[in-house]
Amino acid sequence: HLLELVMFDIAYVISNCDYEYSSDEKKYLSVILDRYSDDDKELLKLRTQFLDNVLDKGIEEVKNFVISLSNSLKSKIDDDMKIAYLDLFKEVIMLDKSVHENERMLYRILCEQWDQKSNI
């Protein structure tokens, strides 16, 4: 459950780091939210408020946040999981049909942290 939350955090900041929230990205996050019970939805809403604060502090803060999250996961998930999550994050990035510089940078950071090749 904690792993899912961390992945939600990463997906959320990636989808918002271009500071243009496309309707496709919104749909995607609402699909994720639909999987959760009402109690968990409340928790996720609080998390998004926290994540919005991180985003408001600028891309350097977001970068540090993603580095610390990906570091904490490094030894907890195997390579197959890393690849699956990177694919998921890539999907989130591609939803608005364009790759913003910030999205590319965060994706590359994740790839580097997890010893994977970036294909964006």
Roles of regions detected by a PLM:
Residues 1-120:
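Small-residue-enriched hydrophobic alpha-helices in membranes
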